[in-house]
Structure formats: C-alpha cells, structure tokens
Curated annotation (Swiss-Prot):
Protein name from the UniProt record: Putative lipase ATG15
InterPro entries: AB_hydrolase_fold, ATG15_Lipase, Fungal_lipase-type
Organism: Lodderomyces elongisporus (strain ATCC 11503 / CBS 2605 / JCM 1781 / NBRC 1676 / NRRL YB-4239)
A GO molecular function held by the record: triacylglycerol lipase activity
One GO cellular component, as annotated: multivesicular body membrane
Subunit structure comment from the entry: Binds to both phosphatidylinositol (PI) and phosphatidylinositol 3,5-bisphosphate (PIP2).
Lineage, highest ranks first: Eukaryota, Fungi, Dikarya, Ascomycota, Saccharomycotina
Signal sequence interval, chain numbering: none
Residues in the Lumenal compartment per record: 50-552
Amino acid sequence: MLHITEKEQTRGLRQLEKRGKRLLPPLIKFIWFCLISAACVAATTFYWLRLSPVHNIHKHSLNSSFEDKGEDGTLQLKHIFHHGVGEKDYKIHKRLDVTQEYLIKHSAYFQNMVNEQQQEVQEIQEIHKRHEKQEIQVKYGPDQEYNQTNTALNSVGTEYKSRLSTNEYDWPDVHRGKNPFDIQLPFKNKQSIARRIKHRNEPFFIESYLDYARSVNGDALILNRINLEWIDDDINIPNITDKDTIVTLATISSNAYVRFPQNDDDKKKSDWTDVGGGWIPDEENNDVNFGWEDVGLRGHIFVSKDNKTVVIGIKGTSGAGLPGGGSDETTKNDKTNDNLLFSCCCARVGYMWTTVCDCYEKAYTCNQDCLEKELRRKDRYYEAALDIYKNVTAIYPPETTDIWVTGHSLGGALASLLGRTYGLPTVAYEAPGEMLALKRLHLPQAPGLPRHLEHIWHIGNTADPIYMGVCNGASSSCSLGGYAMETACHTGYQCVYDVVTDYGWRVNLLNHRIHTVIDDIILVYNETAPCVYQAPCRDCFNWRFVSHDDKE
C-alpha cells in the first residue's frame, strides 16, 4: 500500500495550484471570446435589420408606442375651412364644423374608412413577415442560394413599397385604423415670449402695412418712419423637444390631405357655413364642389379641450408631381403657387417653360414690382391663408387663445409666412425655402429680435431634395413634373434629421412625403432633431431684379 506523507501531500497541492493558475487564464480568455463574439453577432444582426427600410417603417408604425393619451392635453379636429382661389372662385370661403352630429351623419363612411385601413395594415404585415423571412435567408442562407433568395427579397420589397404607395386615405401608417376626424392627438407646450405687432389683429391693419411696404419697394428707411408698435406677449409655444408633440403637429399637417365624405347633400353645401362674401349658388355656379374636389386652399383646425390652444393645419401640394398628398384635384393651383413662391422669376427656367406670371424681362432679369404684385393678388394662396386666419380668430379670440400654425411642403411654407405675418408659433415640415417669398412680401420683422424668441421651426431631412433645395435642374424630378423649386433658404430654425449619414438613405423625392417623415424618420429616432438657426443664405444670386424706379 502506497503511503503519502504529509510533506508530499503539501508539495502535490502546491503543484496543482500552480497548474491551475497556468490553466485559468486561457479558460477565462475563451469564455470572454465566446461572449464578445455572441454580442458582436447580435449587434451586427440588429444593425443590419435596422437599416432595412421595411423594418424601420413597421418598428414604429404597426407596433408603435405612440398612442392617444385621453382627453387632457389633446387636440381634436373641430373645423375645416376652404378658401377658393382663382379669378372666379377666390371670394368663396366656407367653414365645415366637425360636430358630433356630423360624425354620426357620416358614421358609415368613417367606419368603412377604418375597416379598409385595418385591412391594409393586415396586408402590409403579411408582406412584412415575408420580407423578414427573406432577410434571414439572405443573411444566413447557403452561398449557392444567395442570388435566388436575394431576387425574391427584392420582389417582396417592391410589393411592399407598391402597397404603401396606395394609401387611399392619405393617412400615416402609425394611425392606420383610426378615424382622422375624431382622433385625439397629445401635445405639450411651454411658456415663452412672442414679440409681435400690437395692432396686428385690427381689421385691415396688416394688409395696409403690406400694401404700403410694396409701394415703397420695401425701403427700410421709409418703413422705419412708421414706427410700428411692438409688444412682448406671454404665450405658450409647442415643445419641439417632445417627440409626441412633433408627431402630433405632423399628423395635423397630414390630416389636411385626408379625403372627407361627399354625397349629394354635401354638393348642395348643407354641411358648410358661408364665412366669405355671401356667395350663393346660382344657375352658373351650382356645380361648384367644396373640399377636396374644388380648387383652393384648405385649413384643418384642431382645438384643445379647454379651447385655449388652436392649431391651424394648412394643406400642401397635392398630386403625383410632388408626393405628399395622394390626389390630383388641386394640383393645377398648387403648382401655380409653388412656382410663384419658390422660383426666381415666375418659373422661367427655360424657353420651353410656361410661366405663371409675366414678370420676366430678359435673360436673368426679372421685374421685382411685378413679382410682389403677383404674390399679393387676392386669388393667390398667401391671401387665402390670411383670410383663413382671420376667420379662425373670429371664433377663437387671439387675446385669450394660443394659435399655432403647421403644414407640410407648400402648406409648411404658407404656415411660416402666416406665422411671420401675425407672430404665431409655427412648425413646418419639409417646406421649400420661403425666405425669398418673405422678402418679396415685405413681411414685418421685429427689430432686434433675440434668437431665443424666434418661434419658426422647419422640420426636414437630408434625403428630401425639396427641403434641401436641390430639386432643380433639367433632369430633376421636380423639373420633369413642371415644378420650378429654385429656393433653398429658410427662415427661423432648421431641425434636420440627417438620415443620409445615420441610415444611408439616398436623396429621393419620395422622402418628401409627410407619411415618410412621420413613420420612417421622427418615430425611428430616439430624440427630436437638434434645431439650429438658419445660416446666412441667398437664393437666385445670379438673377437681376429691377424696379420701375431703377435707372439703367
């Protein structure tokens, strides 16, 4: 029998201890290697899937945490204003009140709308599931099956994008299945100070100032002699660092595109109240339809439960030419006002173009007086926006109500101009540069206004060629559609989501859509975009604008 002494036993334990010390570090390294490898694989998979356009859309649109938050601190659609434009219809101005009786009257239409939206959601979810399945096969499938699977993936992606483009009710995916006419949208505000003209709401005061400013060609020395009285008002402004508030205002901008019910009674104007010049249907005009099918500008009015906050949502450009809305009924007048507001000279891009006014004189020379007169015509959208505001204030006194303005695309630019005119907080989405139009209109600007009192915010993304001011040139999508979008300079703050750098997006006109902004951008980012003041900027620098007073 082998006998081990205590001394030998101690020596053996020491040897085992030394051997353990030599073996332990490699074991720990192996364990750490496995953990790090697993983490890298998980992170890579998550990042790869996150970059997928389909994943981005449905991560927040079909399973979004953005929900209605009850009645407190919410906004709901209460009125729709329609203002006719054009030489024939610009005096027509009607208001539709979205009352409980109105909702009950058209309940069948709204229920059908909700049902069809829910069906669209289910169909898109099925496409999304097939897309995710193909994604996994592409990433982890055998090499010999890669080309076949990738082709299938592209096919599913094409089907998905095609399905999204048939959004019949022009409604964001995050709100699919909800009635646009009774949805309650949460918002947050914060206190601030607004410096604005004291007598701005007196009848014809603003119009008289603008007419005089145009008559003196905006001469600052002459205008300063008027000594406009500016005051600092304590107001509530939208909290633009709150994502729900940004989504709410974007939804209001989108809501202005939504179709609403029209039947024989609507065509007889039974639901509309005349707030204009007493227009009455007659034998020559009894076929005029208000709302979406008629030419003109529309404003959707959302009101808080306590009636202390009112938001005016101005409809933007309709039609396939500039995606944003889904229908073509108002495309002609939208295009005219787009080309008037955002081109250097009446959309005189080339000799083949049809201009929207007669201000062009010769090569890169334009009549400034003519341009300013065209913008102030009563049948243009800017004047229509002023009338909508005045009719809103007839219901909700501006002395006791916080009035905000929002809009998308053309609607966003008009919202900014309206906000500048009356000193209203404004949040514009993907609006073309409106600084040139502001100068041509000679809108009043508070002297020595600190930047922290600037309440104009432009929400945009770097993949939108219209917002970035690059949708021009002979081969651009805008030019091919007949739009002369030549401006890039905005006023106020710019809050830009850099989707090109962050997600590898390419500049594409489809990224101008308000639905893309809501579903694929704002809701995807964890925080709202940082806002910076507009850097020095000048549009149409190669043009010469002459006045009748100029001596050549």
